[in-house]
């Protein structure tokens, strides 16, 4: 097998998640973050991690599952983007008020009507005051 020179951002996040080996990952696919749970689920199915992967019916449920897992003492992660984050807003404020250290990978995308997949920070700015402690933006 040849040397791989680079990873996409989503592959890099999934690889970092593999190294973390969280207890629970709950995610619902939304463009452009879909590849994160997709790549990570291959690590789960191949036995590279012993994470409980929860495929949920919505982003609201993804954050709810992370809140439940983290409240029980598990390390929980999720990934989302744009309108998916908007659907999580209610639960993000609950997670923040409970001071739960949930890791969420947010792949920035414009929040708007159908088919806007261009990059901006309107999704992150919508929840910036939720007191999720750290935000790292990378080009």
Language model feature labels by segment:
Residues 133-139:
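Flexible, glycine/proline-enriched loop segments at strand-loop-helix junctions
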